[in-house]
Amino acid sequence: MKFAIFGNTYQAKKSSHAATLFKLLEKHGAEICVCREFHRFLKSDLKLNVKADDLFDENNFDADMVISIGGDGTFLKAARRVGNKGIPILGINTGRLGFLADVSPEEMEETIEEVYQNHYTVEERSVLQLLCDDKHLQNSPYALNEIAILKRDSSSMISIRTAINGAHLTTYQADGLIIATPTGSTAYSLSVGGPIIVPHSKTIAITPVAPHSLNVRPIVICDDWEITLDVESRSHNFLVAIDGSSETCKETTRLTIRRADYSIKVVKRFNHIFFDTLRTKMMWGADSRV
């Protein structure tokens, strides 16, 4: 099998996990392609002598499977690079939460064995696409988790006129607005009171950030509907964050958000159940009285 490997470049203390991964793949005779930035980190900063059959930059690669070793941020970066290639991504967690990258280092050897035995499942995760006339945002307009519209200064709110399929929904007076996929519903959106959505749901969550009204609540819509946003701000600009990567926009910029025409394929072990992950990693439903 041919693997393309992405990793974070700041967790030097956890370098042993990366070394273990390369040894496991070598043991199986894998063809290993490594993101050049990650390879440089392993060789120069960590002094690891790892096998790499090829190095690649950006999205200039092909493989049977992508492996992301790091946290959920590394997984999102890998997903952005994979784009519409249709290559499944396996996430190995050396970060903190590990919701997308949910294979622990202790499970790594067993998981690689399962990959070679074709004993795993692949989940299709929907992606959001942002359409606008801002060339900087169009460099990478796709989000696996969320697209967030946020105020740029620390004092005043922004007004976000929101329409669904051309029909007026409301004008949010808030610090921002988060448009999230089911995958992203357990990320930024959840932290501001958004709903938890099962990953396979064909929906999009719209969640305001610190709204200036008790009557404004999150809303869930069909994922084949189109969202149009017009923003007003005292500073005459605002931030757009696509899976955490932000750009400043002029308030004259109209944003259109819709489901992308491709999905991200996520590799899951058969014993990794979404509801189990909610309970163990987010303590969902935990009762300290018991």
From Swiss-Prot:
Localisation: Cytoplasm
Top-level EC class: transferase
Gene Ontology CC: cytoplasm
Keyword Transmembrane helix: no
Binding site for NAD(+): D72, G73, K77, N145, E146, D175, T186, A187, Y188, S189, L190, S191, A210
Organism domain of life: Bacteria
GO molecular function (one): ATP binding
Cofactor: a divalent metal cation
Enzyme Commission identifier(s): 2.7.1.23
UniProt keyword Metal-binding present: no
GO biological-process terms attached to the record: NAD metabolic process; NADP biosynthetic process
Gene3D superfamilies: Probable inorganic polyphosphate/atp-NAD kinase, domain 1 (3.40.50.10330), Probable inorganic polyphosphate/atp-NAD kinase, domain 2 (2.60.200.30)
Family: Belongs to the NAD kinase family.
UniProt xrefs under NCBIfam families: PRK01911.1
Protein name: NAD kinase
Organism: Bacteroides fragilis (strain ATCC 25285 / DSM 2151 / CCUG 4856 / JCM 11019 / LMG 10263 / NCTC 9343 / Onslow / VPI 2553 / EN-2)
